[in-house]
Amino acid sequence: MSIVEDARKGIITEEMKVVAAQEGVTEDFIRRGIASGQIVIPVSPYRKVKLCGIGGGLRTKVNCSVGTSTDIVDVDMEVEKVKAGERAGADTIMELSTGGDFVEIRRRCIEATTLSVGSVPLYQAFIEAARKDGAVIHMREDDLFRITEEQAKLGTNFMAIHTGVNRITLERLQRQGRHGGLCSRGGAFLTAWMLHNDKENPLYAEFDYLCEILKEHEVTLSTGNGMRAGAVHDATDRAQIQELIINAELGDRAHEMGIQVIVEGPGHVPLDQIETNVRLMKRMSGNKPFYMLGPIVTDIAPGYDDRVSAIGAAMSSMHGADFICYVTPAEHLALPNPEEVYEGVISSRIAAHVGDMIKLNKRDQDLAMGHARRDLDWEAQFNLAINPARARQIRNERASADADACTMCGDYCALKIANKVIKKLD
């Protein structure tokens, strides 16, 4: 029996108890959320993980993606990136390799973390076809489902599966065109395969069979966003919305079968369309957990896309997004290194917190920081910081002669002066 079926029968599982304690909500709140499809807890019968709940009424979670490319296959570096992401405070990891030995890389990454791990099975299926037969268009449908099951048995907790890329979606895309092209690797692979073979997407055509695999291995379905915009000028277009409609329908079907479901959202969205996207996706999916890929809010800042994404992620979280995929400074430029992974996670965690200050009224940490600064309590400030080591490092590198002040103001520290004046008035 799946965790969804347990929840429907009124059973509060150990996982629900753990997440309720983490989030400061009742155990029945979590149970009802899972039963209704508004909360998920990615689990696996094959490995124990640090549990996290994703969905309505819970803290916004951050995903850290790692993985090789065809140009850079360094398994040790990917393991370091996993560790860097976890050290920076990521809630989940996605392993998205496209180069090297897929099974070995995924196994190493899974073994390196206590966090829930996600994957995109079609990457391996299409790339193995290209290696064996010369092109992704030769991918065999049976291999796609076989690889999905193999990845589940490795202990994968959730999978991004591009169920909404079908003939109707492609027709919308072809009629309309795009300024920024098709940026989803999974969407591009499927588009090429479908057009060459004149066949429907097997993940859509055989959706019930896919769900049987996911349910058997208790894998959370994340409905992949193959038609997401790759440029802000393409945001919220017909192809994206068509895919959302299909994914929302299939998400309902999967949940009815006892599978936990996350709905993926777009990746390049201008600020004035973020609220629209979040509300539309929440409405159409029945308030299922919403996974925003960034989003990037302007296309002109390569090298700083972690900051660009943080702007979009904060607003997304504020309006109801539940899950944020981080973006690194290397986005659109290169495969990130461990340091860039760390920075990307920190940027996204800041954004998630900023959103939760509004969405969940979570402001206690900020209030405590205000008091610590007023009181010139540096140790408390470090402990309250989202990255204590970074805050401590900067202060120590440029320490003031006055232990209470910092080198920004030195002898003329406004807080110190004001505190003395107020004390005299008292």
From Swiss-Prot:
Enzyme Commission number, as recorded = 4.1.99.17
Name the positions where Zn(2+) binds. H268, H332
**An individual GO BP term:** thiamine biosynthetic process
Q: Its pathway?
A: Cofactor biosynthesis; thiamine diphosphate biosynthesis
One molecular function GO term is: zinc ion binding
Superkingdom is Archaea
Which key words are in the record?
4Fe-4S, Iron, Iron-sulfur, Lyase, Metal-binding, S-adenosyl-L-methionine, Thiamine biosynthesis, Zinc
Q: Where does substrate bind?
A: M94, Y123, H162, S184, R185, G186, N225, G226, M227, R228, E264, Y291
Which residues are recorded as binding [4Fe-4S] cluster?
A: C406, C409, C413
**Reported cofactor(s):** [4Fe-4S] cluster
- What InterPro entries is this protein classified in? ThiC, ThiC/Bza_core_dom, ThiC/BzaA/B
Q: How are cofactors bound according to the entry's free-text note?
A: Binds 1 [4Fe-4S] cluster per subunit. The cluster is coordinated with 3 cysteines and an exchangeable S-adenosyl-L-methionine.
Annotated catalysed reactions: 5-amino-1-(5-phospho-beta-D-ribosyl)imidazole + S-adenosyl-L-methionine = 4-amino-2-methyl-5-(phosphooxymethyl)pyrimidine + CO + 5'-deoxyadenosine + formate + L-methionine + 3 H(+)
One Pfam annotation reads ThiC_Rad_SAM
Q: Which family does it belong to?
A: Belongs to the ThiC family.
Please give the function described in this protein's UniProt entry. Answer: Catalyzes the synthesis of the hydroxymethylpyrimidine phosphate (HMP-P) moiety of thiamine from aminoimidazole ribotide (AIR) in a radical S-adenosyl-L-methionine (SAM)-dependent reaction.
PANTHER family attached to this UniProt entry: PHOSPHOMETHYLPYRIMIDINE SYNTHASE, CHLOROPLASTIC (PTHR30557:SF1), THIAMINE BIOSYNTHESIS PROTEIN THIC (PTHR30557)
Q: Which HAMAP family match?
A: ThiC
What is this protein's name?
Phosphomethylpyrimidine synthase
